[in-house]
Amino acid sequence: MKIFKFGGASVKDAEGVKNVLHVLNTVGHEDVLLVISAMGKTTNALEVVIKNYFDKSKELHASLQEVRKYHNQILLDLFEDEDHDVFFDVNAHFDDLEYFI
């Protein structure tokens, strides 16, 4: 088994995500375990969202929109067709989170 860990800085943008694919294409897809951290500073950004939630801050929705915008930009850089299912899937998670908060 091959295990690969990609930290947040290594998947902070579309080029980093493409590099993960390159590694998989190089070593193969069988008997591989990937551990991938949150992209870029997403963990920090989500901590801000959570803090805003508990503080009942007026910045709550704006802070969540920043995280959504960041992920959507990466998707736009990776996929030419904005009708690709991945846009729906990722944004559905953000919609669920938005509804929750």
Residue spans for each PLM region:
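Nucleotide/pyrophosphate-binding catalytic subdomain
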Residues: 1-101
